[in-house]
Swiss-Prot record:
Domain PAS: 178-250, 357-427
Tissue specificity remark: Expressed in fetal brain. Highly expressed in brain and placenta. Lower levels in heart, liver, thymus, kidney and lung. Located to endothelial cells and neuronal cells of the suprachiasmatic nucleus (SCN). Also detected in endothelial cells of the heart, lung and kidney. In the brain, specifically expressed in the thalamus, hippocampus and amygdala.
Protein known as: Basic helix-loop-helix ARNT-like protein 2
Cross-link (Glycyl lysine isopeptide (Lys-Gly) (interchain with G-Cter in SUMO2 and SUMO3)): 287
Organism: Homo sapiens
Subunit structure: Component of the circadian core oscillator, which includes the CRY proteins, CLOCK, or NPAS2, BMAL1 or BMAL2, CSNK1D and/or CSNK1E, TIMELESS and the PER proteins. Interacts directly with CLOCK to form the BMAL2-CLOCK transactivator. Can form heterodimers or homodimers which interact directly with CLOCK to form the transcription activator. Interacts with NPAS2 and HIF1A. Interacts with PER2.
Length: 636
């Protein structure tokens, strides 16, 4: 009984405390709600740690938390409620701070977005102003993107890069010159006439007085007239094309960045700047003033000779310019058409194009036919231009190694040998007269040559002679099939020189002419040695032997190439015996060093050296006697 009474008393006390605490808890937790009964409070306390939807907490754990709360409330309700109030106030304070931070961030973002918007608007306004300043952007029907506008601006600046302020603005003349003086100087320098023509109808707005010197027109008779009335009918379309002002701006291909297509513009110039695409230069034929021609006797009254109108070829150069209509005095015509666009016209200078009269001879002026050859000091070809094949018929390899004198006509040898000696002794260019050169087909072509020598700058030795050969038209001569006597020479020279017809060799050239160049080279070299050396030992035995045994090629070329006479053979035999006797007693070779050197030079004389050896063998071995060829089985 006592226990039951104590439990009842404890429950009573607990109920009283709960009744006292319930209003406080209800006021703290939900200030807008009124205090409820004990049952509602207990149910509220039991439902406080209810599991939230979607949480992973265990229901048993939530029950344990509820029991702990009840236990704390039963032990010290006031302390627990005060601690709970502090936690609630702290959480509410943190929530307030988070809200203030969010408000500040939102305000900052709004300010930043407003700044960016103002920047974009300012950039768009600048792009629009830039597009309004660029002539290529004005006539566009649709709005261009920013990248296209910037590209057009760059192209426009590039087109103006080559222009100077003196040609763009109004200050195009020096301050000390007046407009009339400057115009007079321009017309005097250009030797033409200045004119201004409207681009729409071709109306002549202005023409200078100097037009009377070229076209025989008065200044007043042309002003206000149409230029197309004075043009040749075949030139009207061309001049209209030049007067068209659709391409007054620079001709650039513009690509839209969005679509990737080319931007086509129909430009109407509204500024006075001179663009690179506005320059005009063309030729046209303009009528001159009527010239009365006197009627000749026997001519019909309606003859075309009564009135003669002549066309002159005029070279027109200038620029297309645009002005407001009120400046050029065209406002009335513009008002009648209700057109407020600028007036475009051509400002140009016309110059008379000279007419070249063709030659009466009928010959056409063409570039002269030339080819280049190089030959050594002795006249042998070392280089032949490929163009020589079309003129001479020889391949370059056919001429290499041969002497140029083998192809020169014999009548030109004297002149060419003098030129050959001159070019070896001089560093200047030597011009030859016209001479005949034998072609491959046997005919002779006439050439003129310019010779000059080339000296090696390191060795200081003359290496070769350069010959620039020019073909002289209309002077080719066919080869002669029969023998022609050399009438220019004396009877004595003609009797000594053998003019034989050799198969495969055209007449007009000399047999053995290949040695002429070598003789000239040796002569010039000897002359240079004599001039360079101050002393020459001619009295030494070696010099005597050299003088005795040296073969003179020049004398051989002029002598008759036949067996010597018996007296000459005797002298030659005696000389040979004396030479052998001297060689035996002196124990020296038959030929001295000088003779051996001259023997080498003799071998370079080609045909002359071979003829000399044949004469010597005929004299020594009896090869010149007729032989018995009866035993030979073939016919000769």
């Amino acid at each position: 009984m006592a226990a039951e009474e104590e439990a009842a008393a404890g429950g009573k006390v607990l109920r009283e405390e709960n009744q006292c605490i319930a209003p406080v808890v209800s006021s703290r937790v939900s200030p807008g709600t009124r205090p409820t009964a004990m049952g509602s409070f207990s149910s509220h306390m039991t439902e406080f740690p209810r599991k939230r939807k979607g949480s992973d907490s265990d229901p048993s754990q939530s029950g344990i938390m509820t029991e702990k709360v009840v236990e704390k409330l039963s032990q010290n309700p006031l302390t627990y409620l005060l601690s709970t109030r502090i936690e609630i106030s702290a959480s509410s304070g943190s929530r307030v701070e988070d809200g203030e931070h969010q408000v500040k961030m939102k305000a900052f973002r709004e300010a930043h977005s407003q700044t960016e918007k103002r920047r974009r608007d300012k950039m768009n306004n600048l792009i629009e102003e830039l597009s309004a300043m660029i002539p290529q952007c004005n006539p566009m029907a649709r709005k261009l993107d920013k990248l296209t506008v910037l590209r057009m601006a760059v192209q426009h600046l590039r087109s103006l890069k080559g222009l100077t302020n003196s040609y763009v603005g109004s200050n195009y003349r020096p301050s000390f010159l007046q407009d009339n003086e400057l115009r007079h100087l321009i017309l005097k320098t250009a030797e033409g006439f200045l004119f201004v023509v409207g681009c729409e109808r071709g109306k002549i707005l202005f023409v200078s007085k100097s037009v009377s010197k070229i076209l025989n027109y008065d200044q007043a008779s042309l002003t206000g007239q149409s230029l197309f009335d004075f043009l040749h009918p075949k030139d009207v379309a061309k001049v209209k094309e030049q007067l068209s002002s659709f391409d007054i701006s620079p001709r650039e291909k513009l690509i839209d960045a969005k679509t990737g297509l080319q931007v086509h513009s129909n430009l109407h110039a509204g500024r006075t700047r001179v663009y690179s695409g506005s320059r005009r230069s063309f030729f046209c034929r303009i009528k001159s003033c009527k010239i009365s021609v006197k009627e000749e006797h026997g001519c019909l009254p309606n003859s075309k000779k009564k009135e003669h109108r002549k066309f002159y070829t005029i070279h027109c150069t200038g620029y297309l310019r645009s002005w407001p209509p009120n400046i050029v005095g065209m406002e009335e015509e513009r008002n009648s058409k209700k057109d407020n666009s600028n007036f475009t016209c051509l400002v140009a200078i016309g110059r008379l194009q000279p007419y070249i009269v063709p030659q009466n001879s009928g010959e056409i002026n063409v570039k002269p036919t030339e080819f280049i050859t190089r030959f050594a000091v002795n006249g042998k070809f070392v280089y032949v231009d490929q163009r020589a094949t079309a003129i001479l018929g020889y391949l370059p390899q056919e001429l290499l190694g041969t002497s140029c004198y083998e192809y020169f006509h014999q009548d030109d040898h004297n002149n060419l040998t003098d030129k050959h000696k001159a070019v070896l002794q001089s560093k200047e260019k030597i011009l030859t007269d016209s001479y005949k050169f034998r072609a491959k087909d046997g005919s002779f072509v006439t050439l003129k040559s310019q010779w000059f020598s080339f000296t090696n700058p390191w060795t200081k030795e003359l290496e070769y002679i350069v010959s620039v050969n020019t073909l002289v038209l209309g002077h080719s001569e066919p080869g002669e099939a029969s023998f022609l006597p050399c009438s220019s020479q004396s009877s004595e020279e003609s009797s000594r020189q053998s003019c034989m017809s050799v198969p495969g060799m055209s007449t007009g050239t000399v047999l053995g002419a290949g040695s002429i160049g070598t003789d000239i080279a040796n002569e010039i070299l000897d002359l240079q040695r004599l001039q360079s050396s101050s002393y020459l030992d001619d009295s030494s035995p070696t010099g005597l032997m050299k003088d005795t045994h040296t073969v003179n090629c020049r004398s051989m070329s002029n002598k008759e190439l036949f067996p010597p006479s018996p007296s000459e053979m005797g002298e030659l035999e005696a000389t040979r015996q004396n030479q052998s006797t001297v060689a035996v007693h002196s124990h020296e070779p038959l030929l001295s060093d000088g003779a051996q050197l001259d023997f080498d030079a003799l071998c370079d004389n080609d045909d002359t050296a071979m003829a000399a050896f044949m004469n010597y063998l005929e004299a020594e071995g009896g090869l010149g006697d007729p032989g018995d060829f009866s035993d030979i089985q073939w016919t000769l």
